[in-house]
Regions:
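Extended catalytic/binding region for NAD+/ADP-ribose chemistry, centered on the ART fold
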Residues: 47-80
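Active-site and NAD+-binding cores of ADP-ribose-processing enzymes
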Residues: 1-47, 81-204
């Protein structure tokens, strides 16, 4: 893996070339398969770095298996305020039998069985989107949008937030459309997730 600076018309962008070994959690039998378009909602996927216009998909990977698991299992993370409220409810024993529910934070076996984890070697040129050099170039372009979403600034902290996804998706679309001498400038983005460094690789 090597780091360098790439100049585009708007300014300098920090890039990482050939990041090396990455982890992915995906569906059996081939976890590297792109998610089919028929699973896109209204023609668009809703990942943080997916295209808001539905022109491409993003394949997410992480530098560690733990980081991947924390990301894909985030939706099972219990809401502590909701858990406290539920603890205060006295459940009818008959309801528990007729309408059984999983305890908060429990991952059902049905989620686990079709999935597997694997490693691969990632090659290509990836925009280091939270690098200070990149941010200084992108900030004038996206500060207004960040402020409209109620964020105090367009900075690394804003790009690490899970929401509003429209902000990171718009940045992703801009980077996807950036070309140098008629060729795509980036193969994807390298970003800091809430748990570890991660990458998103783009494909139509």
């Amino acid at each position: 893996m090597s780091s360098s600076i790439l100049s585009i018309s708007q300014g300098d962008i920090a890039v990482v070339t050939d990041p090396g070994t990455v982890w992915r959690v995906g569906y059996r039998p081939d976890p590297w398969t792109w998610t089919p378009w028929q699973y896109a909602e209204n023609g668009r996927f809703n990942g943080r770095w997916d295209d808001p216009d539905g022109n491409y998909r993003t394949l997410y990977t992480g530098t560690t298996l733990l980081g991947c698991l924390l990301e894909v299992l985030a939706r099972f993370r219990p809401d502590l305020a909701l858990v406290n409220e539920l603890d205060g409810i006295i459940e009818d024993p008959d309801d528990h039998v007729v309408y059984p529910t999983s305890a908060p934070g429990i991952v059902p076996r049905s989620w686990l069985l079709p999935r597997t984890a694997t490693t691969g070697t990632l090659i290509g040129t990836f925009c280091a989107v939270t690098n200070s050099t990149t941010l200084s170039t992108l900030r004038p372009l996206f500060l207004g949008q960040a402020l409209r979403y109620g964020l105090p600034d367009f900075d690394a902290a804003a790009l690490r937030l899970a929401k509003p996804r429209a902000l990171t998706q718009t940045v992703s679309s801009f980077l996807y459309g950036t070309t140098i001498r008629g060729e795509a400038a980036f193969d994807g983005v390298q970003f800091q997730s809430s748990s570890s460094p991660a990458t998103g690789t783009n494909s139509p």
